[in-house]
């Protein structure tokens, strides 16, 4: 059988971090010591029963058995507009300022292709969600990462963008609460980003994947649109995976600047499929859930974070307070790279974590653990790590 070469574009793409982790996990013998996977962010909690009941009823509706519209049902776009008005005080035109798609990855990967020209720069943070770097490659653009660190609360400083990069910027991508560090946005961050956008006439994309998960239930993460005029300069993507525990349902949307939405919708008709009508009906139900139901869904992560942070303190493993998302960003012990430490945990105690280097050079020296593994698994994993006495050596 002949073996054909991949295209130059595919050859130049980085190996997906999570596919690498999946391969590593498959190589571990777990018969005597079951693998505990803390590497990925797939929610372990059930989808709200109201949403499940909604899709069960919608599946039998013959109106959902044909090809769905590329634009999404008018009812789901109106539900999105109502949701944003209720939660963020933002008025949206359902026809021109909203796009729906099969999961937010399509949005954060597709919007760059819709607005960035070859040779331009996509500016984001380093570390960052790896898809932003691959989106630059697929757009034939350059990626410039603003290094963020613990000293800066993992927030970028746009004064650090070189003039050459700023002059040829095609898009700025932000993601707060931040994956992988858990950092929370401040009003000053979004104000600075907007000033940069206006100064250099560059659009903004805010990946609001962890919109519902601040450091506490009172600490509601900021939308980009909390800033005046932000809708004029950017778009915000939203996923149902985290807020509504609907990771397998594949539904997301983008809202904001009409010209960006229009460009993306055109790309969407050539590149992606549409969303099953029954899933759209279920999305309407999810968007209509009362605020207290949403708080119940995310309270699980707040409780887990509190317990895990307490356990980390017992291990003398330093951890930053006030982290959003359902991840914790942890410094590795002295003498290890992030990859070495991740491999040690996998081989010695069968605990899989995400090495910081997988999120960019700025992630070196850290690992990311997920709080979606369940209470017992999380504490059991930390007990296994404690048995290695790695942090006793640093005391």
What feature does the model see in each segment?
Residues 2-103, 110, 288-289, 391-395:
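N-terminal small-domain helix-loop-helix segment of the aminotransferase-like
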Residues 124, 145, 173, 204-206, ...:
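Hydrophobic residues in well-ordered beta-strands that form the structural core
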Residues 227-302, 306, 389-390:
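Conserved core segment of the aminotransferase class I/II
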